[in-house]
């Protein structure tokens, strides 16, 4: 399994729509960086957030109550305030169409990590298609800004030595084609 370089990421995005919109170079002046890097792509967070609150006393991933989260639009301010010790969901600006022989792993940016903001995203499986739902935690005892339309995490691409027998698309993955923030789902 090989880690893919900037030239491969660029070709797959421009010729096959793997990442759209695609920024061919890293943008980093006066913003948290995003765009193509040497062996990855820095994704941007959109301006819509869902802040988890304590309206109900329990989060159940098998039976998630949407009332446990409040939608917040940060497009006017340009940032979202994540309260101390809080958790929110967001989504990428970029839409992904993963090749069948490639898996992507997403890691939070050090700029946020150094402020106690932890970003988690599960792997982008072969032939996954959609916007990425991003999980954001503030591990500090202070409120923190998360900047909309700026970098939030880096994606690295790993190409398999052989083609998988069954992709995410083949098995009808429950988050296939997701748009915007997607809450937890259980197939029934």
UniProtKB/Swiss-Prot annotation:
Query: Which InterPro entries does this one have?
Result: dCTP_deaminase, dUTPase-like_sf, dUTPase_trimeric
Residues in the active site? 135 (proton donor/acceptor)
The chemistry this enzyme catalyses reads: dCTP + H2O + H(+) = dUTP + NH4(+)
Q: Does the keyword Hydrolase apply?
A: yes
Q: Which SUPFAM superfamilies match?
A: dUTPase-like
The biological pathway it contributes to is: Pyrimidine metabolism; dUMP biosynthesis; dUMP from dCTP (dUTP route): step 1/2
Q: Which positions bind dCTP?
A: 109-114, 154, 168, 178
Alphabetically ordered keywords of this record = Hydrolase, Nucleotide metabolism, Nucleotide-binding
What does the record list as GO biological process?
dUMP biosynthetic process; dUTP biosynthetic process; nucleobase-containing small molecule interconversion
| Entry's Gene Ontology molecular function annotations | dCTP deaminase activity; nucleotide binding
Say which domain of life the source belongs to. Bacteria
* Pfam families found in the cross-reference section: DCD
- This protein's record includes keyword Secreted: no
Its EC number is 3.5.4.13
The record's function comment reads: Catalyzes the deamination of dCTP to dUTP.
UniProt record similarity statement: Belongs to the dCTP deaminase family.
This protein's assembly is summarised as: Homotrimer.
| Protein name per UniProt | dCTP deaminase
> Can you name the source organism?
Helicobacter pylori (strain ATCC 700392 / 26695) (Campylobacter pylori)
Query: What is the organism lineage in this UniProt record?
Result: Bacteria, Pseudomonadati, Campylobacterota, Epsilonproteobacteria, Campylobacterales
Q: Which gene encodes it?
A: dcd
